[in-house]
Amino acid sequence: MNWSFLLQLVITILLIVLGANWLLSSFLLDFKRDLTGVALSQQSSISSVRKENETAYYRSILVPTGFPLTTGLGLSLKYKIRNGNFGDVWNAIMEVSKGKNIIKFTGREKSYSLSELNGMAKRIFPKLSNKNFKNIGIANSIATVEGFTLSLASMMTSIRTGSIPHFLPAVPRQRLEDVDVLIIDSWKSFKMLNGSEDWYKLIVVCDDPIESLQFDANCDVITWKELIDGFTKDTEYQYTPPDDNSDDKKLFAYVTSPWNGTNSFNQICLVSNIAEFIKGFPLGNELNSNEYLTISTKLANSSASLQIWGKLFAVLLHGGSASFINPTTIDCESLQETTLLFTETKDVVKLIDSNSRSGLLNKIYLSWATNLLSEGIFTKIARIEPHSLEKLRCVYLADNVKDAEVISTFPEKIPQLKKTNRRITPSTEQLNKIRAQLGSRVVLELYCPYAIMGPVAHTNFYDYRVFGKSVDDNVVCYGTLSTTLEGKMVETETNPHLNIEKKQGMLCIRGFSIGKPVESDRLEKALHLAERFGGGEGWMPLVGVFGLFGQDGCLYIYNQ
């Protein structure tokens, strides 16, 4: 045997393999990557100066320093630019859709066209506006056709008559100032009012009118079916804005949290949230008329519904459709038409666990797919249900801040950070497995419920990076701040170990999607806290939310 020949052959094969690997990693993979490493390492715009005891200001690279944050829809009115309001949004939705696209609600087999829903809302509108009611309390899920149409009609009154929808976590146990109308789900809930029905000028019950015969009501009570009786399909919603832009400055909604703190949100919060969601889609993957948004009903429960309107209206504005689904019943078959899914992480994990395949070939596909994703290359080769999930292109995972109640109370004393390695949110490696098995992009979003409309921050559509275990055990990457917000880290006396020089601290934000405390004592505390940590200037400290801004400009929150 010629050993010299064998040695040459081995060396030649080794050189070919190394050369092919170099060529693949240096050139071919770069052409296939959705986003370059340079782009992923520079995701935020950072102000050039900072004050003592705080970091520079961070904002998404989509809204560079010196340019305005996302503040609305940028509509024209003569020589002016308007932010817009609900009236503009619904008018445009009806013009784009011609009433044909649909929404499917829970508890109903049929889907409702927008012309039906618009006709119902316009039929309800006179009843909610003819007595000059102040606020309209809504304690019914938006995932039902009754709750949705009543909310829609209430939003119409916010522009036309000034009556404001007030989203409630439950039927109030105490009298709420200025709430003249109460919307509840059933006669059972009506029975539990136990005398408090006298607080309201009108009560709307979303239940069968026949059952009303069992109750001897001394107040003005009407059912949803009676309200919409005689409605007709309507493909138009006429709205002409006033010349002084006054409608853009009106209130959009009040939202009360489960711990009884109420915040008000202006029309600019709504339109900015819509624009922010639209802006989050990269070139080539924009929203289109084929979109079908599926929303978990848990995210649509009355006061929690604050987070769904931006996504829902954005999809409808592009001629898409939507549905609400009970998270306990999510399966691959129920997602056949879905292009965008908005739910919580545990629901997606459960879906994958119930459909994952354990064969050797499937494991090879999954390993291959996750490796490609870690290189920045998207693939659908490991999708668990190729037929059912064919249309699914992006999943939005809602993650809430650790203690929204503490943030809502604006406490004087700042809590201590207590780090833990116990991570509830999926690691970056697990997120890539979810992407691989669903065959879709996954965007992780951070919410501060009841206080901020839309996400505080979210990961990039194309960000598939995998961090080391030590990083994942310590922090969660939530990407950049929403384009409606800018933020900074501030130093706190109770956490001296967080080094502001290393961009560590407590998160403060300001922008156009933040609610304003309604109660005078909460408002006073909020102003005092803003002055203490931000020098006023509109900053809102998210008390107890500790993290850092990375070299890539992304927001990293410590595991607590």
Swiss-Prot record:
The keyword Transmembrane applies. One of its GO terms (cellular component) is endoplasmic reticulum. It is a multi-pass membrane protein. Its main location: membrane. Keywords: Membrane, Transmembrane, Transmembrane helix. It is found in: Membrane. The chain crosses the membrane at residues 9-29, 61-81, 136-156, 305-325, 442-462. This is Putative uncharacterized protein YHR045W. It comes from Saccharomyces cerevisiae (strain ATCC 204508 / S288c) (Baker's yeast).
